[in-house]
């Protein structure tokens, strides 16, 4: 990824252009059983790690000196959340602005195959009452249309948290977007179905270190 192909922005993260074709599979280490199911490596693991560290810096700048309840959206958000929390801890450990964190979990079901369903299922919503009066940082893997996150935020508002911030590794450019933007964005990407780094296609591909584009053969192979 060069400066000309991908541009950084504090407001919308690193913008991956529509014409970005990614990297050839054979220049990276990938599980053999997935190689025929992938189109390209879209965002390499090292780039994800560096961008996550920068987001941690921004969070420290904005909400340091607070106790934060980190609400990790499972399953796709767990790896981004783990890495982000670790970066924040490392920064906090060597800073005058200390952030103490407690991590909680929620699951949102909104996909079948590669299609976003109309109804969002919240699993673990009965625990949301614990967030009353708390500073909450929601950590998500990807914002697609924005409707899922908007629905979750509306649900959280019923419990009157003190503050809510959202960090999403990816935000997808989509014609059906409601224009919702998280407070912290890793990468803004084209409207492509991505897998890897804990993002899945029917529970497959979570174990990939890189973010990749799944091909049609892969979609058909793992379709339910």
UniProtKB/Swiss-Prot annotation:
Gene Ontology cellular component terms for the protein in this record: cytosol
Keyword list, A-Z: Magnesium, Metal-binding, Nucleotide-binding
Presence of keyword Nucleotide-binding: yes
Single GO BP term: purine ribonucleoside salvage
GO molecular function terms attached to this record: hypoxanthine phosphoribosyltransferase activity; metal ion binding; nucleotide binding
Pfam families noted in UniProt: Pribosyltran
Residues that bind Mg(2+): 140-141, 200
Residues engaged in binding GMP: 140-148, 172, 193-194, 200
InterPro entries assigned to the protein according to its UniProt record, in alphabetical order: HGPRT, Hxn_phspho_trans, PRibTrfase_dom, PRTase-like
Family per record: Belongs to the purine/pyrimidine phosphoribosyltransferase family.
Protein name: Phosphoribosyltransferase domain-containing protein 1
Organism: Xenopus laevis
Upper taxonomic lineage: Eukaryota, Metazoa, Chordata, Craniata, Vertebrata
Gene: prtfdc1
